[in-house]
Amino acid sequence: MTKRYNNANEAYEAVLDEILQHGIDFGDTKAIFNCGFYIDNPSDKLITNQERNWSQNYASAEWYWYLSGDPSVDKLSELYGRVPPIWDRMADNRGEVNSNYGYQWKRNNQLSYVVNKLRDNPDTRQAAISIYDAKEHDKYSKDTPCTYAVQFSIINNKLCMSVYMRSNDVWYGFCNDQYQFASLQEMVADMLSIETGWYYHHAHNMHLYNNKL
């Protein structure tokens, strides 16, 4: 049975515990595979676990960076005051990254496409955004997007969303990723004048780096 959690923090703590108990050694991580679960209240997206010491200020800056659609890490620095080391390492020689998901969902007007599809037909199965793009493989030498796709459905007049990822680090990645995707879900629901429903999160490889064990 697919697991369900009330909010993001509950999901984080449960998945972290599962990795610690059942994860296998995989490179420089402990990992579990095909990890999928529902978050029933995705708007409850703050990570309150004290050991994690998660920063809403950073997550909010990252969200506005995504909204800008600007893949430059300089834009993130403008919003947050500095560039976190992980983004510095992933930036290409132009100072740009492929994992600015806002840049990806604006590509080919994908976000507008999704909203229009849902407005035209609430029962559509075509309201999907592609993040990973095989046509961009030559750009993925330093930064390969962790997310494949995001799909939306209106169920009982609520906007439900599924996120599919090739890889997700529970400590750094999931805590911020779920915040960004839940914010996207809220934004699309607002455009459609409906409430949000569940958020389903699936990672082929969900892991914790060994330096966090």
Go through the PLM ranges and name each one:
Residues 1-213:
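Terminal, non-catalytic protein-protein interaction segments that mediate quaternary/complex assembly
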